[in-house]
A protein has these predicted regions:
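ATP/NTP-dependent adenylation/nucleotidyl-transfer catalytic domains that generate, transfer
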Residues: 109, 116-124, 159-213
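Core alpha/beta nucleotide-donor-binding catalytic domains of modification enzymes
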Residues: 1-171
Length: 213
């Protein structure tokens, strides 16, 4: 296991977060890579939102560390509640079937078209092992095993769309349908299977109509 942490430089205490992660890595005997990138400058230069710039900087950093360490699997901590927020966000943006599947348990990093110094290898994957697990279940596990996670204060700010959905929109929708989160996860699973079948049928039809020379 090799731990990687990117300091986005967006909060005064972000350096403390990096030190917290470094301390845990040392305690557990893991090697670690820590870097700071100016996400605000990236956003301004490329005319991206802070969310978009942060995502690109984060995954570019992780892909670069993976290549330096000669590994082909990156694992991140997205959970079932993150999935619900992602599906709802894609729905609001008018995404098609591909987007309404939500996040995938395993994603080829090359498909993310990152601005890495060298091309991302085809075999490099992004894994999300906690995708079936809810945030409440993760917090219960931490309490049971006396693990003290560090909270990102920016998660409480509703200036970001994801946080607005988490703190304002989802609670309102759940007042109408208390089972909304489960319903959105089921919808994502249905779209995932539909997308798989359509892709399979498309490939089969392509083989029939395209002549190879």
């Amino acid at each position: 296991v090799h731990v990687a942490h990117l300091d986005h430089g967006l909060r005064p205490d972000s350096a403390d977060d990096a030190q917290f992660v470094a301390g845990i890595a040392r305690e557990w005997g893991f090697a670690i890579s820590i870097e700071r990138r100016d996400v605000a400058a990236i956003a301004a230069k490329r005319r991206l939102s802070l969310e978009e710039a942060g995502r690109e900087a984060r995954y570019t950093f992780l892909a670069e560390v993976a290549q330096e360490e000669h590994v082909n699997l990156i694992m991140v901590g997205h959970n079932a509640d993150d999935q619900v927020e992602t599906v709802l966000m894609h729905l609001l943006r008018g995404a098609g079937m591909g987007g309404l599947r939500g996040m995938r348990p395993l994603t080829p990093m090359a498909a993310m078209h990152l601005a890495t110094a060298t091309p991302v290898p085809a075999e490099l994957r992004l894994g999300r092992p906690l995708l079936p697990v809810t945030r409440a279940e993760i917090e219960a596990y931490c309490n049971e095993h006396r693990l003290q996670p560090r909270q990102d204060a920016s998660n409480a700010e509703t200036t970001f769309l994801r946080n607005q959905l988490r703190h304002e929109v989802l609670p309102l929708l759940e007042s109408v349908n208390p089972n909304l989160r489960a319903a959105l996860r089921r919808m994502a699973a249905v779209f995932t299977e539909d997308h798989r079948v359509l892709q399979q049928a498309t490939r089969a039809a392509w083989e029939q109509v395209v002549a190879r020379r």
